[in-house]
């Protein structure tokens, strides 16, 4: 079944180099410009204002939720609102403790260190963070053999912003050192429509309101997907010579791209069909699903499942995953209890 990887999926929420370029051009600078995530924004606004009034570094922030929801963008906005510099890296990029020490030593008072995929930090690297986050110091081991000794290095107060799609994989000692923990939710159709309209201005194109709504409905609650689909639909509209992207062109384009009215693509439908046709709709164990899809279990849980769960196409049970009646109807199967 494995014929389309996450980076190739038009509705895949994982970031590509093209996505990063697009998102950089679309990135808001202030919380007031950041569309959606109202609860997170209102709380962060208070925390930022309080920290600035006390002339202190903002407390450490953990942002978690599915990919493509704007965690990196929000980190940059937070740093900008605080009036400080942000240094960006990722968990896999920090291979050893020395790499983290080098990053920390470059920070000025109040600066933000942003670590994406923080759940993928190596254990020795994570342990260096403990004292850095809690007491703003690190111990560096220098010398060899009998001359080995630890050097106590103070750090300026800084803010660590960690982003993760797998909050459950963070160790308790690391998670407990974050004073602010925010859950990023899937976006509403209304917020996605606003994002699409805003992005169309940046892309120097026009889109009819009803077309923007249709695009928002199929964007899986994810701004990254919405912007990617907007670019592709824009291509179809320009080839047709439309001055503004129409609803007809939007529907036709998404049909050709195999994105249905619920935002499911060919890969989603194959996964659901496999569960229905091979296992009677479930329950199916996660390892069995992974073997059929040709992915590891982490990819299933992180990439495929979140949207299917959120939209009610599958459920989790103690014995595995089951397909819902909604999925049967969406794929044109008779309801399960009628079979």
Swiss-Prot record:
Gene Ontology cellular component terms for the protein in this record: cytoplasm; Holliday junction resolvase complex
Binding-site positions, DNA: 316, 321
UniProt keyword ATP-binding present: yes
Source species, domain of life: Bacteria
Top EC class, one word: hydrolase
Pfam short name (any one): RuvB_N
Membership in a protein family: Belongs to the RuvB family.
Protein's recorded name: Holliday junction branch migration complex subunit RuvB
């Amino acid at each position: 079944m494995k014929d389309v990887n996450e980076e190739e999926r038009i509705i895949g929420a994982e970031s590509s180099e093209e996505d990063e370029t697009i998102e950089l051009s679309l990135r808001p600078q202030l919380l007031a410009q950041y569309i959606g995530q109202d609860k997170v924004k209102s709380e962060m606004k208070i925390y930022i204002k309080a920290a600035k009034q006390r002339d202190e570094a903002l407390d450490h922030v953990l942002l978690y939720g599915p990919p493509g929801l704007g965690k990196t963008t929000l980190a940059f906005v937070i740093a900008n609102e605080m009036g400080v510099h942000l240094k960006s890296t990722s968990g896999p990029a920090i291979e050893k403790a020395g790499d983290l020490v080098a990053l920390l030593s470059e920070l000025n008072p109040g600066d933000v260190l942003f670590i994406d995929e923080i759940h993928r930090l190596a254990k020795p690297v994570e342990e260096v963070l403990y004292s850095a986050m809690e007491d703003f110091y690190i111990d560096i081991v220098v010398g060899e053999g009998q001359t080995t000794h630890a050097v106590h290095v103070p750090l300026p107060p800084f803010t660590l912003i960690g982003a993760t799609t797998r909050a459950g994989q963070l160790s308790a000692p690391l998670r407990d050192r974050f004073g602010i923990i925010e859950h990023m939710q899937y976006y509403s159709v209304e917020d996605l429509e606003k994002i699409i309209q805003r992005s169309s201005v940046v892309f120097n194109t026009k889109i009819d309101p009803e077309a923007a709504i249709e695009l928002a409905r199929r964007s899986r609650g994810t701004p990254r997907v919405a912007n990617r689909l907007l670019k592709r639909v824009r291509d179809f509209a320009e080839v047709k010579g439309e001055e503004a992207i129409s609803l007809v062109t939007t529907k036709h384009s998404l049909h050709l791209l195999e994105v249905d009215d619920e935002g499911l693509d060919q890969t989603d439908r194959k996964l659901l069909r496999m569960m229905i046709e091979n296992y009677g709709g479930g329950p199916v164990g996660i390892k069995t699903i992974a073997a059929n899809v040709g992915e590891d279990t982490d990819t299933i849980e992180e990439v495929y499942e979140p949207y299917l769960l959120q939209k009610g196409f599958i459920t989790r049970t103690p014995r595995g995953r089951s397909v819902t009646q909604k999925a049967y109807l969406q794929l044109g199967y008779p309801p399960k209890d009628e079979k």
